[in-house]
Regions:
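Membrane-proximal periplasmic segments of bacterial cell-envelope enzymes
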Residues: 1-272, 276-297, 333-334, 338-342, ...
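Beta-lactam-recognizing serine transpeptidase/beta-lactamase-like catalytic domain environment
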Residues: 69, 75, 283-296, 308, ...
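Solvent-exposed, polar/charged alpha-helical surfaces in well-ordered, non-transmembrane soluble domains
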Residues: 91-95, 99, 201, 205, ...
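Amphipathic, well-packed alpha-helical segments that form the structural scaffold of globular domains
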Residues: 245, 273-276, 284-287, 317-325, ...
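Conserved, well-ordered alpha-helix/loop/beta-strand core segments that scaffold catalytic motifs
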Residues: 289-341
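Short amphipathic alpha-helical signal-transduction/dimerization elements
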Residues: 544, 596, 664-675
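Ligand-site clamp/hinge motif
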Residues: 650-653
Length: 688
């Protein structure tokens, strides 16, 4: 039996419904009648547009997760041409903006390559500025050879710049109008013009408080360097030029995209570059953003981990700097000649670079702060921007002798028991007028009757002249190539391949014939052989591990932006192998051990009492009359269980023995670092 509905409940329900209807009617009345006009005006003056949302670039880390490069967001000022040129005096507004920028201590991007004051002249231009100017001159109908004065005269007339403005103010206005105009010139492919990059809040507030029209504030990312180390490796980023755009546009890059310009930033662009998103942005009549709706979320770039160990990189740079500056400070006949240098350390088992140092170097954090700061580095003594470790090419000197030894042993020219008498002079071709001497002959001494191990210890030229005389130069070159000398190392950064001295190389360099003397000099690391410090380090690692040459890839791994997903992990890649017997390797390795541990060895003074047994070879690369020789040094350690191989080069360093202390200084740090935990507490904590 159904219960009867009580009259009180019906009344209450009716009252609630009536109240809801009244509220709805009042709200509708307010919306349509009271506020309707205001909403209409707001909607009529609102503008919705689809905008690109820049994706954050991925971070670069060292092998243990220390952050090397990441992002920081910044506010940029860009012009709104539609708004700007609706004003009565756009030129006056531009000048007002420029003055406000200066008053707030900010700087704006001035692209016009003309001096700030008369007499107007062109300033130095980079390739992008030159292309931009050429395109503008063509658009203006001016001759390519038009002077800066003619260009400024055209700008004053074209942009209707009042004659009441001073020449300096006219130049400011013309420069800004030039930057705006060139964005609309066909086929120039210029990125969007950013008036002020990383604008201060003082500047933004000042412009807004004074109701200055014609500009917008956008947010972008700039690279933040967390270290002043590895400047030649990390690289930098920037907006694309026209040539780069032709490459990247097929990959979906917008013209305004930031891309890697060199170093790891360029080499690993495909990982570091994120995918931009899009959003519908609504602005009111005053240009204030009133709403943002993402239609496609931006996808940040990936984390790239390099093989570099930040602690070892610091040690390498400090050791190299300390060693070279100490050499420069000594009052000797050769100290003034000491130039730049490089130190490279690689993992013996994998070939991975652990540290790549150059002297002199620079700081990426300050390099591009201004044109003046860049020019100061560019024009500094000994070319700090030059990556000697990868691009410098040096004769190896006696550090090449282990290669000659392996070639001679493997080809049967000598055995581990073969002894060759050092007489101070190689007399076989004396009747032709050619009789090269051993380095020790200048003191009236000889090395005696050396086997291959002792010859490496003594660096006896006569021994290696004899071996080289019995080896066809192409055979010796084949072994050099197997060691990676004169070959690509596999590193992803720009490098020189160098060259091994051969008949073909001499023909190319000097267009002259190959003589027996060339073969003898090539066997001791002179002649036309030129190798990079990175190649020498990998060569040393190949000796240490018994003949396996690995790629010098600098990429360790790639992870997703938040580190949660492993995208790529580098595996040691074998590029070539030097095949010979174990006892041949043992003989050569023992010879290098004696260089550092026998009193007759050239590196004994540095390593004789060292706590870790080191195998080494010194080299002196002769540069000709009246020039101080280059110093070359290679080593690996520990001798009985090789872990790290090191190559050091100092331009005009006189002799390899004189730079062995640089390698020892680095090894001190290496064996200290390896006894402690080098990883940060949390990889991801550094990226939050």
């Amino acid at each position: 039996m159904e219960k009867p509905i009580k009259p009180g409940r019906v009344t209450a329900l009716a009252c609630i419904l009536m109240l809801l209807v009244i509220v709805f009617v009042v709200a509708l009345y307010k919306l349509q009648i009271v506020d309707g006009k205001a909403y209409y005006e707001e909607n009529r003056n609102s503008v919705a547009s689809s905008q690109t949302v820049e994706a954050a670039r991925g971070s670069s880390l060292d092998r243990y997760g220390h952050v090397l490069v990441s992002n920081t967001s910044c506010n940029n000022l860009v012009f709104n041409p539609d708004d700007l040129f609706e004003q009565d005096d756009p030129n006056g507004i531009l000048l007002q903006m420029a003055r406000t920028v200066a008053a707030c201590g900010d700087t704006y991007v001035d692209e016009l390559p003309v001096t700030a004051k008369p007499p107007f002249e062109y300033t130095d231009m980079n390739d992008t500025q030159r292309t931009q100017l050429k395109g503008f001159l063509k658009y203006a109908g001016l001759d390519e050879e038009a002077t800066a004065v003619e260009l400024m005269s055209y700008c004053r007339e074209k942009f209707e710049i009042n004659n009441n403005y001073s020449a300096a103010d006219m130049r400011i206005i013309a420069g800004l109008r030039y930057s705006i105009k060139t964005r609309y010139i066909d086929k120039l492919y210029l990125p969007d013009y950013v008036f002020v990059q990383d604008a201060s809040m003082e500047l933004i507030t000042s412009l807004k408080e004074n109701n200055v029209p014609g500009f917008e504030v956008t947010v972008s990312y700039t690279r933040q360097y967390h270290t002043n180390l590895a400047a030649h490796l990390l690289g930098d980023t920037g907006k694309m030029n026209a040539e780069e755009y032709t490459t990247y546009k097929t990959q979906g890059y917008p013209m305004s995209a930031t891309v890697g310009k060199d170093g790891a930033e360029l080499a690993f662009e495909k990982y570091l570059h994120g995918t931009n998103g899009t959003a519908i942005v609504t602005k009111n009549a005053s240009g204030t953003v009133t709403g943002t709706t993402y239609t496609k979320e931006p996808e940040p770039g990936d984390q790239v981990s390099l093989t570099i160990d930040l602690d070892l990189q610091a040690a390498a740079e400090q050791s190299l700097t300390r060693g070279i500056e100490n050499m420069k400070s000594k009052s000797t006949e050769t100290s003034d000649a000491v130039g730049g240098g490089a130190l490279v350390a690689v993992d013996v088992a994998t070939g991975q670079p652990l540290a790549i140092a150059n002297y002199p170097t620079f700081d990426l954090q300050t390099l591009f702060q201004s044109q003046e700061s860049y020019d100061a580095v560019k024009d500094a003594e000994n070319e700090p921007l030059f990556n000697r470790a990868l691009l410098g090419q040096y004769s190896p000197g006696s550090t090449f002798k282990p290669c000659t030894a392996i070639a001679g042993l493997t080809e049967g020219v000598i055995t581990t028991g073969t002894r060759i008498q050092c007489t101070g002079t190689f007399r076989k071709y004396e009747d032709t007028g050619y009789a090269p001497k051993c380095w020790i002959a200048s003191s009236g001494a000889t090395h005696g009757n050396d086997n291959v191990t002792e010859a490496i210890r003594d660096s006896c030229n006569i021994f290696f002249y004899t071996v080289g005389d019995s080896l066809p130069i192409d055979t010796l070159a084949r072994y050099a190539a197997a060691f990676g000398l004169g070959e690509h190392t596999g590193i992803e950064l720009p490098e020189s391949t160098g060259q091994m001295a051969t008949e073909a190389v001499k023909k190319k360099v000097e267009n002259t014939n190959w003589y027996v003397g060339d073969s003898l000099q090539a066997a001791i690391g002179q002649s036309y052989s030129l190798f990079t410090p990175l190649q020498l380090a990998e060569y040393c690692a190949t000796i240490a591990n018994g003949g396996t040459r690995h790629s010098a890839s600098i990429l360790k791994s790639v992870r997703s932006y938040d580190g949660s997903e492993l995208i790529y992990e580098n595996q040691a890649e074998v590029l070539s192998a030097v095949e010979t017997s174990d006892y041949n390797w043992a003989a050569v390795q023992k010879g290098m051990y004696l260089v550092a541990n026998d009193r007759a060895g050239s590196a004994y003074e540095t390593f004789g009492d060292y706590g870790v047994k080191v195998a080494a070879k010194t080299g002196t690369a002769q540069l000709g009359d009246n020039q101080v020789n280059n110093a070359i040094f290679i080593c690996y350690a520990p001798y009985d269980n090789p872990k790290v191989a090191v190559a050091v080069v100092v331009e005009h360093g006189s002799a390899g023995a004189s730079i062995a202390s640089i390698a020892r200084d680095f090894l001190d740090a290496y064996f200290t670092v390896k006894t402690v935990d080098t990883a940060p507490e949390s990889e991801l904590s550094l990226l939050q």
